[in-house]
């Protein structure tokens, strides 16, 4: 038998090792990270644009255990820099490309980068229903709700637009994604409401041709 005593005290302060944010300024991305790795998923503004990106994006981190995602977005999306790049494209495309590379999160600036190409795939671990042997891609989330935001855990709840499964257009997917400090992997709980019958589920780890690079 164990005896536990609850008493008032001062909570211990922890350095932030897991955190994330909704980025309306970047077509509704939700991006999150811990001390080892970072991820993002895509939202309704990107879907409205017509770009096809269904899965999770994976960003590498090294040489640091501190949060880096906020700084990467700030560099990539800086309006003054974007305006300068646009101007240079008219007169000096090479200089424009060099300036872009100097601020882009697709280039390693010493602590990692976004080197993973998602596109119209399941990306890095996204789940999808597969009735009759065909993947039904979930596209981008419809709503997001951040439930935990550090210092040691990030959790977000994503609800998706209804899917059409074998003629039934009422199937709604909900995901609760959790990333803890010290883990390279998310824990994701996936629920499909209104699914009428048992249906296979697949998860994507996409390898790109021709050499199988991720």
What role is predicted for each listed range?
Residues 1, 30-32, 38-41, 124, ...:
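Long, contiguous hydrophobic alpha-helical segments, chiefly transmembrane helices and signal peptides
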Residues 1-25, 199-214:
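Extended acidic/polar, glycine-enriched regions
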Residues 146-149, 154-199:
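Acidic, contiguous internal or C-terminal segments within carbohydrate-active enzymes
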């Amino acid at each position: 038998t164990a005896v536990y005593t609850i008493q008032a005290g001062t909570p211990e302060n922890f350095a932030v090792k897991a955190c994330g944010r909704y980025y309306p300024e970047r077509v509704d991305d939700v991006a999150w990270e811990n001390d080892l790795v970072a991820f993002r998923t895509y939202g309704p503004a990107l879907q409205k644009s017509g770009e096809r990106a269904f899965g999770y994006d994976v960003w590498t981190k090294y040489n640091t255990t501190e949060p880096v995602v906020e700084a990467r977005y700030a560099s990539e999306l800086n309006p003054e820099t974007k305006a300068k790049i646009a101007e240079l494209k008219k007169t000096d495309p090479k200089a424009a490309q060099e300036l872009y590379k100097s601020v882009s999160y697709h280039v390693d600036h010493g602590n990692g980068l976004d080197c993973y190409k998602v596109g119209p795939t399941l990306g890095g671990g996204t789940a999808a229903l597969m009735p009759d042997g065909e993947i039904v891609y979930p596209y981008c989330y419809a709503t997001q709700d951040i439930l935990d935001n550090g210092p040691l855990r990030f959790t977000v709840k994503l609800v998706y637009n209804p899917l059409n499964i074998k003629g039934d257009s009422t199937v709604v997917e909900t995901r609760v994604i959790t990333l803890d400090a010290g883990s390279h992997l998310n824990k994701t709980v996936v629920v499909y409401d209104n699914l009428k019958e048992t249906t296979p589920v697949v998860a994507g780890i996409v390898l790109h041709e021709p050499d199988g690079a991720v």
